[in-house]
Amino acid sequence: SNQDEYDINLILAPGIINSVHTAVASKIIDVCEDREDCFAIIDPVIYGKNVGDATEQAETRDSNFAAMYWPWIKVPDSQIGTQRWVPPSVAVSGIYAFNDKVAHEWFAPAGLNRGTIDTAIQAERKLTNSDRDTLYDSSVNPIATFPGQGVTIFGQKTLQKKSSALDRVNVRRL
């Protein structure tokens, strides 16, 4: 975690699921908190879970150096010519990179302008307004499907429990 040796601003480990690999997810967040110059994207649950399972995992964390997103998304796999379900962190990291390139870190990597996941074929679950509210209130950023808009990141909260400016991804990443 030496800042002088490693220049990083984002840490993720697709497939390292908070509900299954709790110690590894904790270590990733610890590194970000120790360095204070990077941010973690943590996948809350394995494929096939529900809103309650995802929010339960967010409740196990309290950090403004990490965020969770849900549900999983289906993307094309050009190497084998099929489609595959991937953890949210796979697509979310691409949205962070896109956002940083076109708008900089101080803008939210979310919403219809900067949060639409162009490579997504579909989200694992079509979230209702109630689902989105439940997730967001629990600090899980919803990945929603909007007619004519596609699959979109629709939240930018960190895992911090206390309300403050640092409970927003764009503020924490400044």
Label the predicted regions.
Residues 1-174:
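A glycine- and small-residue-enriched flexible loop/hinge signal that marks low-structured segments
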